Amino acid sequence: MEAGNQTGFLEFILLGLSEDPELQPFIFGLFLSMYLVTVLGNLLIILAISSDSHLHTPMYFFLSNLSWVDICFSTCIVPKMLVNIQTENKAISYMDCLTQVYFSMFFPILDTLLLTVMAYDRFVAVCHPLHYMIIMNPHLCGLLVFVTWLIGVMTSLLHISLMMHLIFCKDFEIPHFFCELTYILQLACSDTFLNSTLIYFMTGVLGVFPLLGIIFSYSRIASSIRKMSSSGGKQKALSTCGSHLSVVSLFYGTGIGVHFTSAVTHSSQKISVASVMYTVVTPMLNPFIYSLRNKDVKGALGSLLSRAASCL
């Protein structure tokens, strides 16, 4: 099949997590449950923050954005997978695959940058508490979120623009449960040097530098906490940073786990299972981490659910 000039009619085959027919109902039920929990959990976080005036602060503004990104990240991957399992049709069109590649890069970039912005917010709150509301004013908060979205859009568009010049003329089977750029590049029969170079460069810039920013912020936070004389002040500072630090550890831990698994094994099934942790499990767990470890969010959720129950 000569597909190089017919990408509009090209279809890829997503092999999924397993080709065993007996496992498909279990996989469908598991991923449907995780997706519903992800959407409901993150939606509750957004509603709790928007309905409680005490949470109308920079920290929770960034958190509501993070929850929205987590919903979108899962939505760009899981529903298509569920449809493929239910219809027993593993095909995905070239344009749908292109769209999935775009959003599967876009939302993790937003996650990375938002977590970095949140680390800076905690740094200002702990190290410069008297000037916190002056520094983290609504204009700056809006600008920071806008810049993260702009970087995500431009970076993802750059990847997609290079991908659209690729020629596919051989195997169209993707040994994964969604269209991921690295797998698409392996199927191309044209030169992918620029694509691969851009991936490594952007991974360094948008992966390593934000992590260094987070590490720097928390090193300064730790230094400030050690200098505090009040045990109550230390406890309050630790409680405000604990949930964010847990989410950062989970996000980067699963992300590094996927890259490590890809480096040490050629088993596509093992890589796919590792990717589940990064793409599905992490967005699902984030609202639980914030609601269980943050008293303000827990209280807002309790009030929201109480009001909802009284209306029934």
From Swiss-Prot:
Glycans are attached at residue 5. It is a multi-pass membrane protein. GO terms for molecular function: G protein-coupled receptor activity; olfactory receptor activity. Residues 1-25, 76-99, 161-197, 259-271 are extracellular. It is found in: Cell membrane. Residues 47-54, 121-139, 218-237, 293-312 are cytoplasmic. Its main location: membrane. GO terms for cellular component: plasma membrane. The chain crosses the membrane at residues 26-46, 55-75, 100-120, 140-160, 198-217, 238-258, 272-292. Disulfide bonds join 97-189. Keywords: Cell membrane, Disulfide bond, G-protein coupled receptor, Glycoprotein, Membrane, Olfaction, Receptor, Sensory transduction, Transducer, Transmembrane, Transmembrane helix. One of its GO terms (biological process) is signal transduction. Odorant receptor. Belongs to the G-protein coupled receptor 1 family. PANTHER family: OLFACTORY RECEPTOR (PTHR48001). This is Olfactory receptor 7D2. It comes from Homo sapiens.
